């Protein structure tokens, strides 16, 4: 079993749910504000804002919070966020991409660098690992929308490139530039998605033993606990046996 979603599941099971939820809403709100500032505050005219709102709703973010984040973009509170990407190597040589929205580049860079260093990894230059990933669209549906065959058929009709169906969800991959059209076609066939976003998908994975996997998990926890960090992507994989130990 491969991918950052493994560790996401572990973190959600082990975590302080209220604290995790609060931090998630804060990050979703920041993405909505940035999207609204960069384009029109009307989601029908702003694709990035539309996706940000849809993802916020999928995570049960209250409507008031969403509206407040949009209004914040029109205010003069002086908060301007820069989009920054960091790349580096984690324990076991795992490649890591970190996306952040920050109002203080020095603070964020210092925090991210410290996280890598303490884990035994190292922060690299922009472009040092991203060439080993593909920028793609990811559309996720709960398994309740239908079986694998139904979702595969809908995905093919919509122009998607790949489908991975599991017990809990269907993950549909499409070309980066096609995410708007594909997600719209899928919504017509399957209903509203659980999430729609662009991701960094690894071209190949690095297998980790239990010790290294625990070190990577610790690094990911530290990074995702940072308020400025929006997304973290890695190229690890672990065996089912190691996965069970990490989940215990």
From Swiss-Prot:
Keyword Cytoplasm: yes
Entry keyword annotation includes Transcription: yes
Localisation per UniProt entry: Cytoplasm
Pfam short name (any one): TACO1_YebC_N
Disulfide bonds, paired cysteine numbers: none
SUPFAM superfamilies: YebC-like
GO cellular component, as recorded: cytosol
GO biological process: regulation of DNA-templated transcription
Protein name: Probable transcriptional regulatory protein Oant_1200
């Amino acid at each position: 079993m491969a991918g950052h979603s493994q560790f996401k599941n572990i973190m959600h099971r082990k975590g302080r749910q209220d604290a995790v939820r609060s931090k998630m809403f804060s990050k979703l709100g920041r993405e909505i504000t940035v999207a609204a500032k960069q384009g029109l505050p009307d989601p029908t005219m702003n694709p990035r804002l539309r996706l940000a709102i849809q993802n916020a709703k999928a995570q049960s973010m209250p409507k008031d919070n969403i509206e407040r984040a949009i209004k914040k973009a029109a205010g003069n509170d002086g908060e301007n966020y820069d989009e920054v990407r960091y790349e580096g190597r984690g324990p076991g040589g795992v490649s890591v991409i970190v996306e952040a929205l920050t109002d203080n580049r020095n603070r964020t860079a210092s925090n991210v660098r410290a996280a890598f260093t303490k884990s035994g990894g190292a922060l690299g230059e922009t472009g040092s690992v991203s060439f080993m990933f593909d920028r793609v669209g990811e559309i996720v549906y709960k398994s309740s929308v239908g079986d694998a065959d139904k979702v595969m058929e809908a995905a093919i009709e919509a122009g998607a490139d790949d489908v991975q169906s599991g017990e809990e969800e269907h993950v549909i991959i499409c070309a980066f530039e096609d995410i708007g059209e594909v997600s719209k076609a899928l919504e017509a066939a399957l209903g509203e998605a659980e999430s729609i976003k662009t991701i960094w998908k690894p071209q190949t994975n690095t297998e980790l033993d239990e010790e290294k996997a625990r070190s990577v998990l610790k690094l990911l926890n530290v990074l995702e606990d940072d308020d400025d960090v929006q997304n973290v992507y890695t190229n690890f994989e672990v065996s089912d046996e190691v996965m069970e130990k990490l989940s215990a």
